[in-house]
């Protein structure tokens, strides 16, 4: 019943790394970020607009987080999202936090979302602040307190392959020790 939670800053590589970890572990990926983006698109909003909307509509976060917790409790899953580790911690074997400098994250987001660096930088910073305020207000969670994480990884100067390798080395070693057998 392997459960890995990947959280982190916007643009830090959460989804990319979580997807690869899930592939290697041969378990499904539940991405709260993907669910959030799909809901934003359905409502015709960009991410920042939808984050603002979610501030006054807490049922959105609660629904996504309840789904994440349910999947983590069932086991054999990688959950990914800003709050994934806090939501999945009671069930998670490993919780990973990914971070990177604002500039690096903005560059990644500008490429991914095909927008200017300046717009991406503003969006990354605003999304992070909106998340911080919303999660503190909604759940009393300070997303800057990283004490619940088993591994905190700065991806600023790592390739995707290096970040995945470091994450998997840690996960596989932890799971092997915890379950006294080779998992990956």
UniProtKB/Swiss-Prot annotation:
EC number: 2.7.4.25
GO biological process, one term: pyrimidine nucleotide metabolic process
Binding site for ATP: 8-16
Cellular compartment(s): Cytoplasm
GO molecular function: ATP binding; CMP kinase activity; dCMP kinase activity
One Pfam family recorded for the sequence: Cytidylate_kin2
Cross-referenced InterPro entries: Cyt_kin_arch (IPR011892), Cytidylate_kinase_dom (IPR011994), P-loop_NTPase (IPR027417)
Substrates-to-products reaction catalysed: CMP + ATP = CDP + ADP; dCMP + ATP = dCDP + ADP
Coiled-coil segments: none
Gene Ontology cellular-component annotations: cytoplasm
NCBIfam families hit by this protein: cyt_kin_arch (TIGR02173)
Family indicated by similarity: Belongs to the cytidylate kinase family. Type 2 subfamily.
HAMAP family named among the record's database cross-references: Cytidyl_kinase_type2
Protein name, entry field: Cytidylate kinase
Biological classification of the source: Archaea, Thermoproteota, Thermoprotei, Thermoproteales, Thermoproteaceae
